[in-house]
């Protein structure tokens, strides 16, 4: 478990159904895009044109986010659905899809719902 992303469980009602709500958080993105080949990661050791034309890119969970991603996967295994409560902007949407991918890696059949909210300000 990530010490920064606690897990809470409590009884709740969703769409008229009593459920056990499992609530946790993430700290930013769960994954990064990196060059797949180690030799492409050294900026001064490769021709930039090769990076644009020939370099494969892979999406990976960085070491500092592994505990957070593992926490999401562990909790998703026992859930029927996930409600994604992330910011309703581009980054929030991107992070929501990363969280959903982690959930579905652990539980292919998990249903997904998206909470939509906005802030009122003066």
Which residues are covered by each model-predicted region?
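Intrinsically disordered, low-complexity regulatory segments
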Residues: 1-122
């Amino acid at each position: 478990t990530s010490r920064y992303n606690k897990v809470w469980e409590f009884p709740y009602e969703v769409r008229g159904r009593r459920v056990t709500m499992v609530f946790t958080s993430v700290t930013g993105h769960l994954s990064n895009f990196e060059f797949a080949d180690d030799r492409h990661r050294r900026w001064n050791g490769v021709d930039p044109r090769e990076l644009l034309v020939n370099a494969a890119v892979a999406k990976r969970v960085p070491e500092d986010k592994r505990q957070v991603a593992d926490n999401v996967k562990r909790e998703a295994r026992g859930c029927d659905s996930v409600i994604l409560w992330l910011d309703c902007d581009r980054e929030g949407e991107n992070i929501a899809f990363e969280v959903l991918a982690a959930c579905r890696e652990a539980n292919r059949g998990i249903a997904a719902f998206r909470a939509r909210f906005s802030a009122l300000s003066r």
